[in-house]
């Protein structure tokens, strides 16, 4: 992955990106890719903490069979990391962390990622609200 960005990947984000990249060739649909990202994200960084606080588990709470959506074209892991770096730079963040990976995933996968999160127990909106609450609490401490 390209390391020429002003904001380096945090350790958690680097791990999520690497694990996500290894899973993409085996995921034939956008839904399967979103599942892989969720399972990896929920274990790492601020996003993982927020997902666990919301009760987002490894397995889906219910299984629904939506029509398959083709995966994004190209090297999706590279696209996710590149967009995450751009978003972190716009925010003038010191690092590209799992929060920016999540924002990039939501942008690239759109409704597919939101639907996958809902099947695990929380919407993207709820997850972003929880992350905001965690950031506010950290600033107040």
Pin down the residues of each PLM region.
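Histone-fold recognition with a strong bias for associated Lys/Arg-rich disordered tails
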Residues: 1-141
């Amino acid at each position: 992955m390209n390391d020429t960005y002003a904001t380096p990947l945090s350790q958690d984000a680097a791990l999520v990106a690497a694990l996500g990249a290894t899973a993409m060739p085996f995921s034939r649909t956008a839904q399967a890719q979103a599942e892989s990202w969720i399972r990896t994200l929920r274990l790492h960084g601020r996003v993982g903490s927020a997902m666990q606080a919301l009760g987002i588990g490894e397995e889906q709470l219910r299984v629904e069979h939506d029509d398959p959506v083709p995966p994004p074209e190209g090297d999706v892991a590279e696209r996710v990391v590149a967009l995450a770096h751009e978003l972190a730079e716009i925010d003038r963040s010191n690092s590209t962390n799992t929060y920016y990976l999540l924002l990039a995933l939501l942008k690239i996968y759109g409704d597919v990622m939101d639907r996958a999160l809902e099947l695990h127990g929380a919407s993207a909106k709820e997850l972003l609200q929880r992350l905001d609450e965690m950031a506010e609490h950290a600033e107040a401490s």
